[in-house]
Amino acid sequence: MRLNTIKPGEGSKKTAKRVGRGIGSGLGKTCGRGHKGQKSRSGGFHKVGFEGGQMPLQRRLPKRGFNSLTRARNYEVRLTDLDRLPVDEIDLLALQVAGIVPGDALSAKVILSGAISRKVVLKGVGATKGAKAAIEAVGGSIAE
């Protein structure tokens, strides 16, 4: 094999349509656009969503909803998520860095879901009664 003998795979390169090159090609004169009308002219096409002057669908339908600035930014964390964390001291920042809670989280609460197999210390993170019992059962603690 030589560089000057390399060719693209069979059927991978289609030859482009050559329009306006005579009657015999089947795409001569009007180039497959037909006669007259907006679509036959150069630059003659409507914008996306245009309905011929009728009020477009995206403007006929009402706006819906809004993003509340006062929404709760409290998140739930499972025990199995804590088990996967590489650190032993867990606070809100550690949860955010690990991607368990989003960066805009204001508080987090550990819930009894799954199991925990290692000792962890929670700082500034809430926990339900069941989660507290599970954490303390494996030798962990909750510092509030």
From Swiss-Prot:
Single GO molecular function: rRNA binding
Biased composition (Gly residues): 21-31
Example of a GO cellular component annotation carried by this entry: cytosolic large ribosomal subunit
Region (Disordered): 1-54
InterPro entries: Ribosomal_uL15 (IPR030878), Ribosomal_uL15/eL18 (IPR021131), Ribosomal_uL15/eL18_sf (IPR036227), Ribosomal_uL15_bac-type (IPR005749), Ribosomal_uL15_CS (IPR001196)
Cysteine disulfide links: none
SUPFAM superfamilies reported in the protein's UniProt record: Ribosomal proteins L15p and L18e
Pfam family, one: Ribosomal_L27A
Keywords for this protein: Ribonucleoprotein, Ribosomal protein, RNA-binding, rRNA-binding
GO BP, sorted A to Z: translation
Record function comment: Binds to the 23S rRNA.
Entries under NCBIfam families matching the protein: rplO_bact
Quaternary structure note: Part of the 50S ribosomal subunit.
Family: Belongs to the universal ribosomal protein uL15 family.
Protein name: Large ribosomal subunit protein uL15
Species name: Dechloromonas aromatica (strain RCB)
